[in-house]
Amino acid sequence: MSFSKEAFQVIVLGCSGGPKEDNLSSYLIAPIHSNDFIALDAGSLLSGIDKAYKKGSFKGISEESSNPWQIEPYILRDKVKAYFISHAHLDHVLGLVINSTEDIKKPIFAIDSAIDFLRDHLFNWKIWPNFASEGNPPLLNLYEYQRLELERKIFVPNTEMSVQPFLLSHSRNYESTAFLVESKGFYALYFGDTAPDILEPRKYMENVGKKIAPLVQSRSLRGIFLECSYVDKEESQLFGHLDVKHMMRELRHFACIVNPISPQEALKGLKVIIIHMKGDSLKGDFSKELIRIELDRQNDLGIEFILPEQGDRIEL
């Protein structure tokens, strides 16, 4: 699955599911020729922008800023056009809350449950001032909540992208979201935290797979962001996440949807960015390498797995 040119750029602001608080889930995405981004989750913002800028991952942005000494706040305020929050757990919204005092007016897009949790439990004048457009007064209206309708595509203001949300389950009683990002006929799919279908009463991941299978068949899907929180966990200890075994099971099932006759060929060369890798205080930095080793061992689909580092720039 090769392409003549790349369609998207991704800046990795945070790729971990913890426990370190300065590298939490957040990815900026924009068309390859544009620096007008949306944020897919917002666990780390300014700390990730700082690392990415020092790595040289932002192409051409320094020339746009009138003050090179303030480049990171400029990127946060002026180049991040909107936030798409998959769910309201702290490792996906911490940067949004903490950095709100440095931000400017823009929308937060999320499904109803995520917005309700942000409104009632974070931006509420008890945990944090209410910088948003609903909830406990006074409303500061820095962030405007935009409630997403499932599977309805919306166009993102001040960007060249549209986004279509799909429902996921982070556990039996907690909703999460997948976002299908589109620009000029090309797509990238971002999964928020998700439980494997085998442990859920409804097949949420299968539903997403059926909807996007034609995009793989037409080679217009440029990449998938998919969590792999652990190397290996007992099912009772997954807590609404995927480990390598369950992630590969979902990908094999997806391959069968894309190409029932030759599933082993269906996803060959597809870029899958591994996200939400959780650190282990006992194993130190080896957790990520153990995931990499196990993915290499189990990858019988020819997928191009990408295990990002904070601050990386990835082209899809």
Positions of predicted regions on the chain:
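Core dinuclear metal-dependent hydrolase active-site scaffold
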Residues: 2-78, 144-217, 313-316
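Short, well-ordered amphipathic alpha-helices
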Residues: 47-70, 93-96, 119-126, 205-212, ...
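Metallo-beta-lactamase
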Residues: 112-176, 299-314
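Short internal beta-strands
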Residues: 106-114, 273-275
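Active-site flanking residues adjacent to catalytic metal/cofactor-binding acidic residues
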Residues: 40, 86, 190-193, 226, ...
